[in-house]
Design a protein with these regions (language model features):
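Residue-level recognition of beta-strand microenvironments
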Residues: 66-69
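Conserved N-terminal beta-strand and adjoining loop/helix that marks the start
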Residues: 1-19, 40-41
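Residue-level detector of family-conserved "landmark" positions at structurally sensitive sites
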Residues: 63-64, 134
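Unchanged
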Residues: 39-62, 73-130
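Short connector loops at helix/strand junctions that flank enzyme active sites
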Residues: 5, 13, 34, 61, ...
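Conserved beta-strand segments that form the floor/walls of ligand-binding pockets within enzyme
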Residues: 19, 33, 93-95
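Nudix hydrolase/Nudix homology domain
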Residues: 27, 32, 104-160
């Protein structure tokens, strides 16, 4: 049975740069996403954000405010059958900051994750970024006085 997967993602800036996780897709092409991931039962979105960022990057963050929501729906029947838990994702995007004085721990990268990189906002605008709806919209999302619904995208490929 298909599942709607909630995830918490961080827009994490440090010294003017944004942290992104780098990945390779099934074809070997690079793409980037915000650190963060799936919410566990009985876990708040903020708790999920802190846990997932620490797992993927080894960094300890503090959520500052909820910025945006984006949905990703995979329509490919093969994808839906093999990975029902990833076929409809609702990404809750938070502005976050590093917690000062906490040393970085060993990261436990996700499947297909090749590392983490700090990039300028301009560099991020030129990268294949997930969620797709955030491409070219980071400044507008940060400038908004209230959370932004970035919409839903339907994707036909098998991504895992």
């Amino acid at each position: 049975m298909p599942i709607i997967r909630n995830s918490a993602k961080a827009l994490l800036f440090h010294q003017g740069k944004l942290l992104l996780n780098s990945h390779l897709d099934r074809s070997g092409a690079p793409y980037y996403d915000l650190p963060g991931g799936g919410q566990e039962p009985f876990e708040t979105m903020e708790e999920a954000l802190i846990r997932e960022v620490r797992e993927e990057t080894g960094l300890t963050v503090r959520p500052l405010r909820f910025l945006a929501l984006a949905e990703e729906i995979f329509t490919n029947p093969q994808m839906r059958q093999r990975y029902p838990q990833y076929c409809h994702r609702v990404m809750h995007i938070f502005l976050a900051e590093l917690v000062p004085g906490v040393p970085q721990t060993q990261a436990e990268p996700d499947f297909q994750q090749t590392g983490s990189v700090w990039v300028t906002p301009e560099e991020a605008g030129a990268l294949p970024l997930v969620p797709i709806q955030l491409r070219g919209q980071i400044a507008q999302v940060l400038a908004s006085s209230s959370p932004v619904y970035l919409g839903a995208v339907r994707r036909d490929e098998v991504c895992m």
